[in-house]
């Protein structure tokens, strides 16, 4: 076969039908800032759907890192990704507490016995997205359904309701109240101090009713569970009582589903008993059920009304509040923009070739110091991978500082990089459509370059 002894273009014909791709695909690695997901922990992703379900959709602040990862996954199916621990990350909670639970490992090692100041639950991962969540606990038969004392009055076309007796101990926001001769369902928006009046979420339509006796109220999520919480078969055979409870997780703000009030998860008839089991042998203890199955919550502590919660079932009379415990999350924070040091710490998760097998590292929108850190401390150390780097956005996007400014600035950026056979520098940024926010974005090219390299490995 002829070969070239000077630079030129060589044209080859290759029959790809005879190529058998290697079983092991070319793995990429990346660290970035995201709205959700585990922090400082390697996560293996296979496609963009995995990326969205684990780290959530991009917004106007965190889109560059998202699309670098997404663009790589458009070509390849193996990406190890680490979310950086940027300053100010906070898990949303109902107690306005500053809490950071970074990952499942962090929870198991430091918080599985409870989270001081966290209330009953905290958001599973840090980020403002958690502020859209609320939870509701129904821990007793009375909280599920009860009869209000005294009488009530409702007027056609009015959203107010008055009571002859104080209902504060029985009625709470979100409760359903059955009104009128047909027991039409109306929802409580708020209960006045003193409990003798309340506001409905919608005006009452029907005949004005004066002095209706003992109206029925129900838990907000009455129709989402099979029955009132009572005693499970597990507790009953061991002499325990009233161990069952229901927990519902809701997208109150609509940030997860675009539907405010959408129910996300239902934990039906879970148990307050620490040793409770289902018929199939799986745990039914509410703490374990939520920690193992929820995508949105970690358990933080037992509510004060859950008497004997966390005890074994034998001989225990478990208790629960007489009205639902429904709380909205707040205080979750995305934090500030990540620093070079925080990105470098995240990239260090790829330093050991014994812990993770990678071939290409994407630098994203990294500055020269971070790109050098990746080359010098990871690629040069491992000697089995390369780093794909893009110049800074200001070097190549709307750079009109002077004639040939883009070329000069790219050269300056290159000269700030370590000279290494493990580094690859591309030409800049791409302008691509963000389908999640209906906008066009400038995104570093290194995700695409790394992706085409991985794809070439697969088909060649």
Segments predicted by a language model, with ranges:
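A glycine- and small-residue-enriched flexible loop/hinge signal that marks low-structured segments
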Residues: 1-147, 151, 164-460
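Short, structured beta-strand/loop micro-motifs enriched in basic residues and often containing a Trp
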Residues: 156-162
